[in-house]
């Protein structure tokens, strides 16, 4: 009896050792990524948040992923998605025309400024907000929805309990350290972006439209995309604000595999600090190396 017990214990020990040895390379790889992100953060002098979700197996790479960061213009994805959600039941909402006045223009209006004293449809405003980061377009979307709290309500309705939009453009970009207004976490945003673009938060037609808009973004070449192989397809939304806040959220289609969801948020201690898209590109390269 004792001989059998000792043999069984030896087999269990051998199995445990084999399991540990088998997982050691994965652990070392994950630890290496964390160390590289920490080194990047330290060298950049700011605070970095990263969340990567591999939709093939739901594996996650996280760095400060549960800390709050100012969203800045990455919040435009939620506003546009809320309008798309309306279009599931209000078939003509995207073609609804909105008047553009000179008094509507604020600090960045590359598309809406061309339509002063005219109109734009909600579809055109959504495209302007997502693909050119037009701030007046964002405000028009928010106004149509009924205010920032309605954008937050949409987030709650699709299962995001972290996102909060409190203000309109341009004040939502103040990004004051410790200010919870207009913030989310990298992980929450990654999960929501996945739900909106690859999941069931939107109908098939609306989901396809959102993906098309994101793939047509004109502002992201120097951010996440710059850290990826040129053959990969990217749909993203950038954002920037005070304290050198520099953000990008993306759906990524590597060649021959399931999509990746990547959120990179970065902010700095000085209010007048310059944007650091290079930090986002470096973070993207670190976490996607090996895919």
Curated annotation (Swiss-Prot):
Localization of this protein: Secreted
Keyword flag Repeat: no
Keyword Nucleotide-binding tagged: no
Catalyzed reaction equations: a beta-lactam + H2O = a substituted beta-amino acid
SUPFAM superfamilies documented for this protein: beta-lactamase/transpeptidase-like
GO biological process annotation, one example: beta-lactam antibiotic catabolic process
Signal peptide: 1-30
Residues where a beta-lactam binds: 76, 133, 169, 240
Top EC category: hydrolase
Similarity comment text for this entry: Belongs to the class-A beta-lactamase family.
NCBIfam families xrefs: bla_class_A, blaCTX-M
Functional note: Extended-spectrum beta-lactamase (ESBL) which confers resistance to penicillins, as well as first, third and fourth-generation cephalosporins. Has cefotaxime-hydrolyzing activity. Inactive against cephalosporin antibiotic, cefoxitin, and the carbapenem, imipenem.
Name this protein carries in UniProt: Beta-lactamase CTX-M-8
Species: Citrobacter amalonaticus
Gene from which the chain derives: bla
